[in-house]
Amino acid sequence: MKPLWQQYIQIINQVVKPALGCTEPIAAAYAAAVARTLLPVAPESIAVQVSDNLYKNSMGVYVPGTGKIGLAIAAAAGALAGNADAGLEVLANVTPEQVAQAQTLIDAGKVKVERTETDEFIYCCVSLTAGEQEAMVKICGGHTLIAEKRLNGELVFTADSAQAKATGSICDGVDINIESIYRFAQEVPFEEIQFILKASELNSKLSDEGMSKPYGLEVGRTMKNGIAAGIIGEDLLNKIVMLTAAASDARMGGANLPAMSNLGSGNQGIAATIPVVITAQCYKVSEEKLARALIMSHLGAIYIKSHYPPLSAFCGNTVTSAAASMAMVYLAGGSFEQSCFAIQNVISDSSGMVCDGAKASCAMKVSTSSSAAVRSFLMALNSQNVSGQGIIAKDVEKTIKNIGKMVLNGMSSTDVTIINIMSE
């Protein structure tokens, strides 16, 4: 296999992985669980410091297995019952009794959470204290990227420069663009990418869960009721929107099922997966072609998102759905040029969507971007595309760079304003 393709597969394996619960509070749970491995006894108090963006994305989302919202319960559950070896599935086996113990610690005022000034978009420092013993774990740059461990002030681990590479810079120094992703997905041996079918399995289970039980705003179930009442039809557009939103409903509502995440986001993993899976079913393609489309969607999303910080004021579901739309064109037998049209169209459609924290209404944003993916894919198949208008350049690579500029240079103050509003 080509060395470049091996790099691509390595990138996918690094940032497309199962995650139980919204990854921002789960980062605190993971840091707490790792810190607990350093202490000889259970902690008596917990202190959590996080970046503004991590704080924003933890304020309104349920922590799986707890039925509760926020960083305090995530850190306490992680410290008392988390599995430090499980990464983003750290809370998979938490029991109701352990949740009660965590809540007791919180009720006693022993769990403190505060924002801290930092240049890192993903930053979480958790300190556990038991008597005179203190363990500290610091995460920087990625949701499970441990930068430092200390016990009683003594440094016991520090990440080297290679280990400390932020998830947002994962494509740095790699020869990658939309065309190379497209060719890779088409030509790489199937057995080398078969693993990506796990994304279909995990995220489809979340979708089924969201359709069968009342989670969050029940966006998916509401659409199902509309279909049953004859108000809307069960066409490809509505089916994709309904099932993608249902998976997000379940995830943001605290379902005890993992999502296959994309670059640290479960919702974006869902947005990169479910529309592609439903389109594959519509066109009755082979399992191999589905795997190739999922690789195209997930790696395309990673590449586009590598142009801006992993947490920002920009809702990443937009560009994730652009990559999904590209893969949908491939499934329908469209050309590479038409796949580029799909990316351009989605970004033109919904690039103004902001991130105001992780919460139940994220399912609505997922449904919005998925709807844009379907419209854009249909337009692309008809060779209709947005080009040279607004932030959309004539070339797809320039458009992607424009998105990066918009987020980095134009939306930093927006992010601060959103966080300040949410903190009032």
Curated annotation (Swiss-Prot):
GO terms for biological process: L-cysteine catabolic process to pyruvate. It holds the Pfam family SDH_alpha. GO terms for molecular function: L-cysteine desulfhydrase activity. InterPro entries: Ser_deHydtase-like_asu, UPF0597. Belongs to the UPF0597 family. This is UPF0597 protein Shewana3_2972. It comes from Shewanella sp. (strain ANA-3).
